[in-house]
């Protein structure tokens, strides 16, 4: 252990350092002194000579001596800071030059020791240290010294609270330093120093950046980082790692060949150009800009006002556009949240300038002005009501502009305003004026505005009816349906059906006033929910099969179709005429029509089976089939232009006994199945026709690759009950007696487009062949006459056996081997017998068919379906994700993305087994508590995202209700109670309110009316007690509670267990209604009146008025209730 340092040792060290002794000897002496300093206190008499000796060593030229001396000096400073800080404070001015000089040393070790020495000296002499750093290190010429001094400044500020205001001018100069690394360090230092500074300091920093003319790139980075503190700290996304894992794989995009074929079924309007892409009227997103003080916000608006004075010129138009963009950036930033009222007042003061920008002839300036108004409407909603009148006048006028961009932007802006602001009758008057405009554009846009208003006010019909808006809506619809422009009429038909869903009686009256042609067009509109043509399927279209040889084929054009038809006609002329005897024969192989060469790419051919070839339709001809799914009258048969070839099949199948001479085989040899000639099978096969031009009446059929389940027809060879795609290798079908063959006098097969499939099938246009054995048909349920009349008459033609491999519509699509490539690997038989020789069909099939699986026609799947078991790994993953989601729901920390992952787990058909009763109850209880939680009780979710989280909670509850309806039944009352409590936090104009009301209406049909009435009565009594303290929130809960109780009373009339209130329940409901009739809120009073009307209709006149009398309702509310009761009785009598 080293001994304590002595005066003689220090004197010897000082003497040897002044001589020419070797460097090693000097370094050894200094090391010995350093060891003593580290272990023992230093005598006071040694302070001064020891500092002198270490100064000499630290400033020497040899690096070994410098290393030993400077490290010893650092230890000496640390020792004296604890032993004698007063002496160290006196010695600091002499030692600081050496330390500051080492801040710029080439070696990083010495620079780090210098920072430590400065930190030690700052504790005893802060003024001297700050002066040396600020006036020497930071303004010197050494870039390393500048960097280290800024590091020391930041470290000292974070650890010891150093006030850095005096360093700001120096930092501003360092931001423009010639050295790039110095600029980067200065930028980082400024950001870290001002990150947690008050708003006034940040505002001063922005002014300093402007005053020192810091380059814009650096200024923007600093301001952006200061305005977004979350970007500089690590986010908490790792907490959601459990729920961020993918649950379901994303679906790959459809191939290009399939996407091109999808356009074949889209109807084309005469007033539209479907090939021209529409204008994108959505505003472009902007970078947010943040303000820190009210003074800074006032300065921004004060500078803007001068740009909007006078007329638009070449000098100020760009400043106006930049001002619009800056206002949008402020809205995207914190101006709305931190300076809500003052920012709105400043916008109102600048409204004249905003209108000048909107009406500018410069498209970019007008576009920015429209985007600004949309952002204001989205951010403030009803808060911008005072500005709506002048804005509506401006934008309605702008919609008639000749510039398409300006017109489309004005239309989008009006749509946004109508969807966000409060409803007034003036808005409907603006729409009515637009419907009467001489230009077609405002009339066309008015249909969209009217749809927006109808969608928004669907749940607030009373407000529209009492202000005269309903009459204006009817006038607008009548005017649009009779408009001279076909595009306006087409758009107004869609609006009419939206109106019909809200006021059906009024809509029926409007339709009755139209002429017959207009009524037919209105009923055939695709937006008509009652149109049957939308649920019927069209025929399979080219390219929709799963065969890679078919899917890879390009879509043939109309020109190819014409050429193919001409070739078929020319080839038919060169063939000898067909014998008359061949016309009357019935081919057991399958009757075919004249098929052109272009239709040979049909998917009906397989390796071991073939379907009936579909007829080829001319590009300009009519056919009984096609892409339209609606039943239609068959077109006239075209006259024969040439004699039919001798080997062609008959035109139709006649009711005759099958002859011994069959028709000629197809042109290409196929693999034959050796079967009995007596066996015949019913086959339904979609045709493959040449595409033709779109027709106005063609339906928009869905194009999908999912198998189609068909009710009542099952596979004869497999006992499984789900339907799927047909297998390329089909086993033999069972025998069918000849008596089961039914021939059609007009055609062999009905067009697949005219065969309606069940509504439960997930896809409409699939290649599907159905095999129904005749031996099974007698064992099936005998259809009623009504069912027989609804089923199409399908001709049964003999054909080679084709089998359907059952599968569930929810399973993933299985892609089988291409029949064309699969056929190459199998030995093909050669026809050695004459062409017209009788062929054995389906011989040797099974004699006893397997039992038929039970089929659920309502749900569209088999009752005996057994789901594919999921893998243990998948089950464990889902279970872990579910547990994580439940825990985060209970702690109210689950965000929007987490809820979406949770919904994916619930939707997973293979993940339902992980939902035990305990997990289901825990999840549902947590969701209800999360839903009704006050915003202050959800600290983990930002305030601006809480409404989105609540919307996801509603979506999750609805999904649980849909998937596990019976498990949900005990929680109905609790759910309605949570909805009422959550309703108190949101205004009626909020989009989440409509979701709450829809969920409440669905829960009513599931729960017990008596229990619901008891629970809601207790909740509403609490709301009535809180009315004085929180009037607005209590009124919202009361309004929704009255509505729910009214629905309980009314909906029970249509249920299997009607609800008749007892005397006690009637008194409870009447008492609540009586108290709500005294409310200061008009919506609460109106809902209470509606509840009274429903009670009167339910319990009768005598019981109702007795209950009202017992509750002591005043005369004025009684008169109002009587008025609405009489009004309802009249409406019921009129509808009856």
Curated annotation (Swiss-Prot):
Region entry Disordered, spans: 524-554, 567-794, 821-884
Classification via InterPro entries: ARM-like, ARM-type_fold, CLASP_N_dom, TOG
GO terms under biological process: astral microtubule depolymerization; cell division; mitotic spindle assembly
Family that this chain belongs to: Belongs to the CLASP family.
HEAT repeats by residue range: 95-133, 167-205
Compartments, as annotated in UniProt: Nucleus; Cytoplasm, Cytoskeleton, Spindle; Cytoplasm, Cytoskeleton
Name recorded for this polypeptide: Protein stu-1
Gene behind the chain: stu-1
Biased amino acid composition, Low complexity: 595-622, 701-716
A GO term for molecular function: microtubule binding
One Pfam family this sequence matches: CLASP_N
Pro residues biased stretches: 659-668
Subunit structure: Interacts with microtubules.
Keywords, in A-Z order: Cell cycle, Cell division, Cytoplasm, Cytoskeleton, Microtubule, Mitosis, Nucleus, Repeat
Gene3D superfamilies reported for this sequence: Leucine-rich Repeat Variant
Broad class of the protein's primary localization: nucleus
CC terms in the record's Gene Ontology section: cytoplasmic microtubule; microtubule organizing center; mitotic spindle; mitotic spindle midzone; nucleus; spindle microtubule
Taxon lineage: Eukaryota, Fungi, Dikarya, Ascomycota, Pezizomycotina
Source organism of the structure: Neurospora crassa (strain ATCC 24698 / 74-OR23-1A / CBS 708.71 / DSM 1257 / FGSC 987)
Biased composition annotated in UniProt, kind: Polar residues: 673-683, 777-793, 822-833
Known function: Microtubule binding protein that promotes the stabilization of dynamic microtubules. Required for mitotic spindle formation.
């Amino acid at each position: 252990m080293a001994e304590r340092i002595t005066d003689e040792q220090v004197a010897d060290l000082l003497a040897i350092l002044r001589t020419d002794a070797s460097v090693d000897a000097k370094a050894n002496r200094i090391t010995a002194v350093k060891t003593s300093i580290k272990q023992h206190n230093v005598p006071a008499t040694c302070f001064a000579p020891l500092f002198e000796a270490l100064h000499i060593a630290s400033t020497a030229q040899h690096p070994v001596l410098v290393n030993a001396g400077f490290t010893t000096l650092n230890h000496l400073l640390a020792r004296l800071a604890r032993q004698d800080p007063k002496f160290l404070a006196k010695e600091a001015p002499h030692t600081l030059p050496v330390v500051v000089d080492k801040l710029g040393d080439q070696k990083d070790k010495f620079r780090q020791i210098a920072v430590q020495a400065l930190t030690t000296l700052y504790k005893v002499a802060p003024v001297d240290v700050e002066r040396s750093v600020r006036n020497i290190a930071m303004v010197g010429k050494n870039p390393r010294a500048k960097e280290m001094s800024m590091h020391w400044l930041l470290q000292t500020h974070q650890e010891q609270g150093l006030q850095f205001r005096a360093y700001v001018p120096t930092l501003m100069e360092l931001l423009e330093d010639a050295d790039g690394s110095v600029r980067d360090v200065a930028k980082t230092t400024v950001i870290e120093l001002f990150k947690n500074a008050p708003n006034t300091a940040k505002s001063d920093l922005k002014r300093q950046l402007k005053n020192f003319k810091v380059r814009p790139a650096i200024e923007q980075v600093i301001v952006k980082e200061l305005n977004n503190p979350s970007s500089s700290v690590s986010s908490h996304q790792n907490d959601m790692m459990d729920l961020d894992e993918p649950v379901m794989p994303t679906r790959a995009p459809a191939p290009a060949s399939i996407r091109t074929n999808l356009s074949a079924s889209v109807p084309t309007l005469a007033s539209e150009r479907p090939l021209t892409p529409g204008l994108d009227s959505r505003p472009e997103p902007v970078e947010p800009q943040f303000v820190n003080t009210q003074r800074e916000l006032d300065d921004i608006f004060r500078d803007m006002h001068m740009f909007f004075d006078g007329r638009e010129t070449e000098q100020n138009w760009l400043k106006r556009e930049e001002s619009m963009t800056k206002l949008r950036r402020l809205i995207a930033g914190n101006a709305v949240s931190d300076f809500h009222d003052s920012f709105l007042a400043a916008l109102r003061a600048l409204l004249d300038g905003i209108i000048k920008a909107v009406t500018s002839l410069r498209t970019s300036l007008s576009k920015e002005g429209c985007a600004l108004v949309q952002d204001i409407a989205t951010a403030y909603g009803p808060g911008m009501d005072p500005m709506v009148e002048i804005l509506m006048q401006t934008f309605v006028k702008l919609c008639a502009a000749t510039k398409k961009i300006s017109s489309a932007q004005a239309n989008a802006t009006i749509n946004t305003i109508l969807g966000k602001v409060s409803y007034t009758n003036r808005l409907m008057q603006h729409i009515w004026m637009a419907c009467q405009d001489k230009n077609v554009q405002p009339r066309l846009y008015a249909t969209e505005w009217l749809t927006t208003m109808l969608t928004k006010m669907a749940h607030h019909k009373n407000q529209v009816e009492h202000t005269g808006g309903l009459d204006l809506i009817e006038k607008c619809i009548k005017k649009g349906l009779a408009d001279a422009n076909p595009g306006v009429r087409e758009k107004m038909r869609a609006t009419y059906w939206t109106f019909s869903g809200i006021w059906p009686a009024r809509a029926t009256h409007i339709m009755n006033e139209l002429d017959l042609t207009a009524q037919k067009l209105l009923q055939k509109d695709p937006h008509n929910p009652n149109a049957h043509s939308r649920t019927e399927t069209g025929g399979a279209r080219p390219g929709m099969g799963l065969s890679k040889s078919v899917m890879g084929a390009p879509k043939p054009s109309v020109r190819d179709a014409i050429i193919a038809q001409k070739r078929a006609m020319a080839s038919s002329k060169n063939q000898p005429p067909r014998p008359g005897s061949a016309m009357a024969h019935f081919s057991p192989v399958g009757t075919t029509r004249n098929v052109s060469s272009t239709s040979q790419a049909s998917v009906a051919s397989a390796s071991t089976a073939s379907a009936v070839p579909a007829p080829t339709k001319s590009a300009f001809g009519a056919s009984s089939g096609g892409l339209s799914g609606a039943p239609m009258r068959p077109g006239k048969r075209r006259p024969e232009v040439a004699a039919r070839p001798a080997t062609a099949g008959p035109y139709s199948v006649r009711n005759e006994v099958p002859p011994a001479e069959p028709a000629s085989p197809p042109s290409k040899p196929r693999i034959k199945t050796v079967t009995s000639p007596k066996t015949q099978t019913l086959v339904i096969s979609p045709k493959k026709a040449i595409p033709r031009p779109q027709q106005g009446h063609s339906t928009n059929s869905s194009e999908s690759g999912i198998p189609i389940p068909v009710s009542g027809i099952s596979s004869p060879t497999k006992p499984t009950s789900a339907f799927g795609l047909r297998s390329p290798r089909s086993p033999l079908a069972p025998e069918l007696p000849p008596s089961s063959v039914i021939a059609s006098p007009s055609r062999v097969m009905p067009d697949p487009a005219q065969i309606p499939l069940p509504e439960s099938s997930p896809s409409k246009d699939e290649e599907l062949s159905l095999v129904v054995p005749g031996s099974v048909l007698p064992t099936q349920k005998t259809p009623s006459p009504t069912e027989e009349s609804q089923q199409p008459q399908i001709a049964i033609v003999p054909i080679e056996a084709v089998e359907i491999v059952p599968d569930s519509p929810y399973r993933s699509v299985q892609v089988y081997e291409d029949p064309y490539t699969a056929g190459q690997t199998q030995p093909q038989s050669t026809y050695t017998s004459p062409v017209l020789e009788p062929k054995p069909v389906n011989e040797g099939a099974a004699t006893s068919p397997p039992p038929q699986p039970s089929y659920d026609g309502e749900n569209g799947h088999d009752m005996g379906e057994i789901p594919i078991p999921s893998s243990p790994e998948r089950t464990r993953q889902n279970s872990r994700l579910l547990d994580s989601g439940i825990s985060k729901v209970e702690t109210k920390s689950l965000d929007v993305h987490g809820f979406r992952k949770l919904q994916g787990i619930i939707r997973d058909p293979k993940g339902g087994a992980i939902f035990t009763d305990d997990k289901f109850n825990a999840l549902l209880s947590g969701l209800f508590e999360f839903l009704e939680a006050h915003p202050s009780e959800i600290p983990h979710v930002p305030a601006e995202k809480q409404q989105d989280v609540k919307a996801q909670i509603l979506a999750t509850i609805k999904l649980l209700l849909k998937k596990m309806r019976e498990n949900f039944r005990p929680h109905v009352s609790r759910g309605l109670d949570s909805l009422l409590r959550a309703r108190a936090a949101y205004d009626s104009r909020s989009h989440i309110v409509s979701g709450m009301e829809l969920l409440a209406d669905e829960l009513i049909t599931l729960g017990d009316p008596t229990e619901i009435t008891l629970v809601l009565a207790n909740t509403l009594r609490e709301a009535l007690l809180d009315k004085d303290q929180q009037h607005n929130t209590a009124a919202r809960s009361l309004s929704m509670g009255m509505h729910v109780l009214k629905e309980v009373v009314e909906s029970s009339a249509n249920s299997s267990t009607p609800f008749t209130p007892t005397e006690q329940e009637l008194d409870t409901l009447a008492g609540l209604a009586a108290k709500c009739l005294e409310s200061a809120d008009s919506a609460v009073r109106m809902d209470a009146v509606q509840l009274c009307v429903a009670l009167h209709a339910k319990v009768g006149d005598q019981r109702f008025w007795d209950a009202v009398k017992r509750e002591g309702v005043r005369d004025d509310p009684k008169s109002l209730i009587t008025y609405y009761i009489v009004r309802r009785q009249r409406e019921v009598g009129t509808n009856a």
